[in-house]
Regions:
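Long, well-ordered, tryptophan-enriched scaffold segments
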Residues: 8-9, 13-262, 268
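Acidic catalytic cores of enzymes that act on phosphate-bearing nucleotides/polynucleotides
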Residues: 254-288
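Short, polar loop motifs at secondary-structure junctions
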Residues: 1-6
Length: 288
């Protein structure tokens, strides 16, 4: 909180970003956590949790988009769904609400428990399969979903540029901008191709995992072809601790320390780290 409140005076560490810049704080913390707990040394707890209970392994369609300057780039679109495949992966009940991922063997998996399994007519084939379990819903066999196509035995892939929007350079009356020279960031992302025939997608379609897209958006350097040198936490590049310092006023060293401690505690306690928002965004929109 930017206010030295009753809560702040009792805290071990008080971080006071400029009002309204907490998103930049969160992005920089995410950058540190991804780099140190997923790449420098993978947390086994985070790895298992991310594969089983998050959307990080799920596949996303990459679409071609023409920028105002005429360049054609790939951008993240929607999730790949069972309805995009010929035969709908055998799903008669809401296949357009069932997401897919890669198993560690490189084959497409239909994870048990996505939203498409949660309602439908009584007596349907997938009735009762709404639990999030590490199983393929078709045969019930155990699966281990891939976070990245580069891991668990890298499968055939390409490294290509994917475009992400950048809003940190917008000048406003009340906030410091951090101009990076462009409002579109091109990041290197490993992609694969699937033969699809669904709504808005047909033929050989480029896809990527949410994890690979998220890591790229956060600016975490993985040493991919064409990625360039890693400037570290002191580089003024989007979402690094140094980048947020220019926007929030919070020293980069404090961001690094808090991110490490927050993630380390979550790792050791299996998830017992919490962000308590208080009477803010969750005070409105029917959250009272």
């Amino acid at each position: 909180t930017p206010d030295y409140s009753e809560v702040a005076k009792l805290a071990d560490l008080w971080m006071h970003p400029k009002q309204g810049t907490d998103a930049a704080v969160a992005m920089a913390m995410g950058h540190v956590i991804l780099k140190e707990f997923y790449f420098n040394k993978r947390s086994s707890y985070f790895d298992d949790y991310a594969r089983r209970y998050t959307d990080l392994p799920l596949l996303v369609v990459l679409e071609d988009k023409t920028l105002p300057d005429g360049r054609v780039v790939k951008v993240p679109g929607r999730y790949v769904r069972a309805s995009d495949f010929v035969g709908q992966l055998g799903q008669a009940n809401h296949p357009d609400w069932k997401t897919v991922a890669y198993n560690v063997d490189g084959q497409v998996a239909l994870p048990n428990g996505s939203i498409g399994f949660r309602w439908g007519q009584d007596g349907r084939d997938d009735q009762g399969l709404w639990n999030l379990e590490n199983k393929d819903a078709r045969q019930g066999n155990t699966v281990k979903l891939k976070l990245s196509v580069l891991e668990d035995g890298a499968q055939a892939h390409e490294i290509t540029d994917v475009a992400f929007p950048y809003f940190g350079g917008i000048d406003t009356p009340n906030f410091n901008a951090n101009d990076q020279g462009n409002d579109v960031m091109l990041r290197r992302v490993p992609i694969t191709y699937l033969d699809l025939n669904g709504e808005g997608v047909a033929g050989r379609v480029a896809v990527a995992t949410v994890f690979d897209l998220q890591v790229a958006n956060y600016g975490v350097n993985r040493g991919l072809e064409g990625e360039g040198a890693d400037g570290g936490y002191d580089a003024n590049a989007p979402y690094t601790p140094a980048w947020q310092e220019r926007i929030t006023g919070v020293p980069r060293e404090q961001i690094i320390t808090i991110a490490r401690q927050f993630a380390d505690n979550a790792d050791k306690t299996h998830g017992k780290s919490m962000v308590i928002i208080g009477a803010a965004m969750n005070h409105w929109y029917h959250c009272d």
